[in-house]
From Swiss-Prot:
Top EC category: translocase
The family this protein is said to belong to: Belongs to the cation transport ATPase (P-type) (TC 3.A.3) family. Type IB subfamily.
Binding-site positions, Mg(2+): D627, D631
Topological relation to the membrane, as annotated: Multi-pass membrane protein
Protein's UniProt name: Copper-transporting ATPase
Residue ranges occupied by any HMA domain in the UniProt entry: 1-67
Alphabetic keyword roster: ATP-binding, Cell membrane, Copper, Copper transport, Ion transport, Magnesium, Membrane, Metal-binding, Nucleotide-binding, Phosphoprotein, Translocase, Transmembrane, Transmembrane helix, Transport
Annotated binding of Cu cation, by residue: C12, C15
Length: 741
């Protein structure tokens, strides 16, 4: 069984990886992925051995709060921004008390002046009050940090909580000695505690704002979903909940309202904003017979539509599910960071303790409390400067921003692995009809042995009973030439060959057939030299003989810009193949015209499947690009499956990437975005590893002899800047652009 739920209380990747590690050890858990950014988890488990309630109890034992739905955040007395502003004000107050006299004695009243650069008792008490206020404002770090430590799952909050608590306890201890007059002054760390918490809070605020902006993509889509719709019942409009709509319901769509579910216009017309699907801002004109999709907006006039999908299976619901899965899943490249994070925090605590002991022993002055002060500063600096957040954010933040960018391009990735793997593709296999071509064959020429209008009337009358795209092309041509369409009887369809029906022909009831050459008994074929899709029209004379009445030559024209986009793809060093069930001449012509490297014609679904198998066995990483309707086996066999879709035609289950642009440019865009994303992730990881590799030893005091020591306050600033730099670098993906040539 697969379930998705939310987890509150996670602060860094050590939290998410700890939950994964703990639950992953259970025999009944098949797979679990926890997303720090989404505060969510996807789990697959054996329902015969456990249930979701038991899994929730296991997570609660680790110190986190699992929830089936993400409840609204509790309203606090202070908003995050006000809380941060207060933290900054009180931090400056404590720093002013601590260091004001060092800068200029006139800054402080005489009663608060320091003794030998050390705060007096009253000064220290005021610092303590300011520090306790700042600690209260940052209390979440202590609650979550010590809770995680108690459950043996230490995280970033644990490091901050331990470090600042140690500094506070040391300061209180020394304040006690001053109060009892055993010491004339003490060396306090109140300003260090405040500055550390302030910098961390600033960093977290910037981080959370950036996360929220990146998560806005799904929130914006959800806002497109109307809660109610106007249902027609006995010629009356009834407002109903969208969840109650079933296939076949007739709905009225008013100007300025959103489409509730996928459907088809049956009366009226409209102009729809489909930018949430395609990324194109221009409205799309829709008339009777056209499909409309959930989440799109009707700009002008009202119309009636028939629902073809319910809310659960609508286009918008599928897109939201894809975005959620993509944001919650993990890329393979993140596994390294997860492994490091699992041992990172315990290792940092061990290093901090070791550094404290070493400095206590080797400190150059014989005074114990001076040595203790140096050792404590090193201990706090090591804990505070280490940044598991930079490691944890390196991959998911880039994936999050990349998915947001993809949706603006009309692209949707199934999961992070799809986004990651697209850049590795070295062979692309294209379906032809509807993928490279318009998918709407048009009549190119007509060859007739009878009067032309009679031929058009016969063919159009029979083909109007078929839903095949070729049939629609012939019917459209007949209508354009004002051919009368007759009533048919005994209509029979032979899939893959053609259609037959009984109708009036030359004063008698005759069986007329329309289809490919294999549909007819041996006849004297017309000499047709043109390339194209051949459709014959004939009269049945006997069971063994048909009379040829004429033939249509149709062509399915390539989509605009396809040739240029394929040239772009080939410049990336990618091999291209065309697989089609069409005849050899048409497929060859299409391949040559578009500059495709190889082709296979007359290909049945099994032939396409075998070709992809063959390419993969040769070590190729294969992307299959199709329409998702009849390419499911080939799409499933490929390494990366791309479905070129228009609304509800999409088969999400078969796709790794869905393009609602229905444009080959999307394939190039997906590959380039994948490359840019992985490059961005590597930059983030490089910075995160380098930062921790360089700054942790510095905090330990390895350059003490060169007079370089990092104070706890500077360590806090460095840690905040580290995670913020990863977030800001990830945001650069927002500026990702595709060059046309």
């Amino acid at each position: 069984m697969k379930e998705s739920f939310y987890i509150e209380g996670m602060t860094c990747t050590a939290c998410s990886s700890g939950i994964e590690r703990s639950l992953g050890r259970k025999s009944f858990v098949k797979k679990i992925e926890v997303s720090l950014l989404n505060k969510s988890a996807n789990i697959e488990f054996n329902e015969n051995e456990t249930n979701l309630d038991e899994i929730f109890k296991l997570i609660e034992k680790l110190g986190y709060s699992p929830k089936k739905t993400l409840a609204e955040e509790k309203k606090e007395f202070f908003s995050p921004n006000v809380k941060l502003a207060l933290a900054v004000i009180f931090t400056l107050f404590v720093v002013y008390l601590s260091m004001g006299a060092m800068l200029s004695p006139s800054l402080l009243p005489e009663s608060l002046l320091t003794i030998n650069n050390h705060s007096n008792f009253l000064n220290a008490c005021l610092q303590l009050i300011g520090t306790l206020i700042v600690m209260h404002l940052g209390r979440d770090f202590y609650i979550q940090g010590f809770k995680a430590l108690w459950h043996r799952q230490p995280n970033m909050s644990s490091l901050i909580a331990i470090g600042t608590s140690a500094a506070l306890i040391s300061s209180l201890w020394q304040l006690y000695f001053v109060y009892t007059s055993q010491w004339s002054y003490g060396h306090y760390y109140f300003e260090s505690v405040c500055v550390i918490l302030m910098f961390v809070m600033v960093g977290k605020r910037i981080e959370n704002v950036s996360k929220d902006k990146a998560l806005d993509a799904m929130q914006a889509l959800m806002k497109n979903a109307p809660k109610t719709a106007l249902k027609m019942h006995n010629n009356q409009q009834i407002e109903v909940l969208v969840d109650s709509i079933v296939v076949g319901d007739i709905l009225k769509v008013l100007p300025g309202s959103a489409i509730a579910v996928d459907g088809e216009i049956i009366e009226g017309e409209g102009e729809l904003d489909e930018s949430m699907l395609s990324g194109e801002a221009l409205p799309v004109y829709k008339k009777v017979g056209d499909k409309v999709f959930s989440g799109t907006f009707n700009s002008h006039t009202s119309f009636l539509m028939k629902a073809t999908q319910d809310n659960k299976n609508s286009t918008l619901s599928q897109i939201v599910e894809m975005i959620h899965n993509a944001q919650s899943s993990k890329a393979e490249i993140s596994r390294l960071a997860d492994k490091v994070s699992s041992v990172f925090v315990p290792s940092v605590i061990a290093i901090a303790i070791l550094a404290f002991v070493v400095w206590l022993i080797i400190a150059p002055k014989p005074d114990f409390w001076w040595n203790f002060g140096i050792a404590l500063e090193v201990f706090v600096s090591v804990l505070v400067i280490s940044c598991p957040c930079a490691l944890g954010l390196a991959t998911p933040m880039s994936i999050l921003v990349a998915n947001q960018k993809a949706s603006s391009l009309g692209l949707f990735f199934k999961d992070a692995k799809s986004l990651e793997k697209a850049r590795l593709v070295n062979t692309i296999v294209f379906d032809k009809t509807g993928t490279l071509t318009n998918g709407k064959p048009v009549v190119k020429s007509v060859h007739s042995n009878i009067e032309l209008l009679e031929l058009l009337s016969l063919a159009g009358s029979i083909e109007k009973s078929s839903e095949h795209v070729i049939a629609k092309g012939i019917v459209e041509y007949a209508k354009e030439h004002n051919a009368p369409l007759k009533e048919m009887s005994e209509v029979k369809v032979k899939t893959g060959f053609g259609i037959s029906a009984k109708t009036d022909y030359q004063g008698a009831k005759e069986v007329i057939k329309v289809g490919n050459s294999e549909f007819f008994n041996p006849i004297n074929a017309l000499e047709i030299q043109e390339n194209g899709i051949l459709v014959f029209v004939g009269r049945v004379i006997s069971e063994k003989e048909d009379e040829l009445l004429g033939a249509f030559v149709l062509e399915d024209l390539p989509k605009k810009g396809v040739k240029e986009h394929i040239a772009q793809i080939k410049k990336l060093g990618i091999n291209t193949f065309l697989l089609s069930g069409d005849n050899r001449e048409n497929v060859k012509k299409c391949a040559l015209e578009l500059g495709i490297d190889g082709y296979i014609s007359n290909a049945k679904p099994q032939d396409k499947l075998n070709k992809i198998k063959e390419l993969k066995e040769k070590g190729q990483i294969v992307m299959m690009v199709g329409d998702g309707l009849n390419d499911a086996p080939s799409l499933a066999m490929s390494d990366v499956a791309v479905v070129m879709a228009k609304g509800s035609d999409v088969s999400v289950q078969a796709a790794d990437i869905v393009s609602f642009n229905n444009d080959i440019k999307s394939v190039y865009s997906a590959i380039k975005l994948s490359q840019a994303t992985i490059k961005n992730i590597k930059e983030n990881l490089f910075w995160a590893f380098c930062y921790n590799s360089v700054f942790i030893p510095l905090a330990c005091g390895v350059l003490y002899k060169a007079n370089i020591m990092l104070s706890p306050a500077i360590a806090g600033l460095a840690m905040s800047l580290s995670s913020v730099s990863v977030v800001l670098n990830s945001q650069r993906l927002r500026n990702f652009k595709i060059k046309d040539h």
